[in-house]
Amino acid sequence: MTATAGTTTARTTPAVLRRGAWLASALFWTAFAVVESVNHGWPAVALALAFLVLPDLTFLVAAADAPRMAKGQPAPRAVPCYNAMHRALVPFALAVAYTVLPVDWPPAFAALCGWLAHISYDRAFGYGLRTKEGFQRG
């Protein structure tokens, strides 16, 4: 079957697959955070929600510089904090450590699930780490 003029055909690109995988990861970590929150009460709910929002609060590190920056661009001095909070390896390694070590405080694990969900949603929607000037990496 051939495509007619003016129509487009769907393509599976690595970027689409990558974003789909990040979306699946986001849904998994969100579901895990909800399960942990339901099982362990308000402290788990509060920490899961806090860590779902916390990574984007790094924009406030240089809030005074915001009027001089482009929309959605953090100031260069906020970029290291932003990138540190948006690396998936950090909360994932902490979650692995939580499961291996004799730590038993479920709200901490719910917080890590919320943090991983945030990072995964960002990647699924096309947001990622920043350059040192604060622009999206390509």
What are these regions (language model features)?
Residues 2-138:
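N-terminal membrane-targeting hydrophobic helices
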